[in-house]
Every structure is written in structure tokens, then in C-alpha cells.
């Protein structure tokens, strides 16, 4: 996005500052992250956020960011895409979806990924083989809420990542608190505004 940001700044005649860092620069800030955020926080974008914040602090004391706009104004591509995909899946009888999803999960993706590598780059799907198990699980989900939770989750069972780990209860586990909206896009935006936004985005910047 740097090229586009520079072009917009030039067009508007605004002051524009760029910062380019090396992998070593990024690695060097990692030991300080737990102290800065006072808690384990796994969003990798905290690293560039910290670097650009330190750059900004050399010139100003307060900055305004655009965080939160995507959740409030339907800015993420996953909202329209998830809406279309789930509406399509809902039309397929559940037994068929369960069968198809299970087949996808056991399908050997490596051969297809190898064949895709011969196609033009725009047709290639990065990490296709790794994505198949999750795709199969998405097809098998029985509700829009569970479909969305699985689509934005890195791990099916986060509690299994550490010994004795237990995933805390969240809004995703309390469907009775969901608002009564007819549009699945609004449901996704609500879930993000009540979970992802305060527990990730606004943990990183406020």
C-alpha cells in the first residue's frame, strides 16, 4: 500500500513519512512486546504498529487511526464473501454438506497444489493443501454463526495449544445474546464489533 499512500499524499499535498525496516529490526522489538501490552497478545501486526508508533512519537504525541471503520461500515471482504458463500451452503441439505465436507478434509491437496503451480500466478491458490481441512470444516458447519467463527479462527480447538488450556467463553458461545437481524452481513459485523474489535484491534491501538 506504500506506493498508493505516497501517491494520495502527493495529490493532496500532505506531509508524508515512510519507514522501511529490516527483518532484524522487527525481531528486535519482540522481547519488549509483553511489557508494552501487559498481556500475551498474538496479533503479529503489533510489531509494525509499534515500529510506526515509535516513528510517530518523534514528531507528535497523539495520532488518529482508521481502526474500527471496517467493522462498523462493512469494510472487510469477508462480509460480502461470507454472505454469498453461506447463503449458497444453506441451500444444500445438511447430510450432503457433511459428506462433501468430510471428503474435502481427507482429499490429498498436494497433487492439486503442484498442478496449480503450472498455471499463471493469478490462478494459483497459496497454501492450497493446508487450506483444504478448514474448507471441509466450513462446508460442514450448521449455522451462520459457527461458519463465521470457524472462518476467522486459526485453530479449531485453541485450548489444545497449551497443557491444561481452556478457551474462555465469548459471545460466540452465547447465541442467545445475538441481535435479531435478518442480514447475515450485519450478524458478522456485530460479532466482530463485540469480539475482534475490542479484544484485538482496540487492544493494539485505541
Regions inferred by a protein language model and the residue ranges of each:
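A short, charged helix-loop
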Residues: 165-176
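Short Ser/Thr-interspersed hydrophobic loop/turn segments at strand-loop and sheet-helix junctions
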Residues: 56, 193-206
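ATP-dependent adenylate-handling active sites, centered on carboxylate activation for C-N bond formation
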Residues: 1-166, 184, 204
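Structural motif
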Residues: 42, 179-192
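Short alpha-helical scaffolding segments that buttress acidic/His motifs in well-ordered protein cores
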Residues: 30-34, 191-193, 197
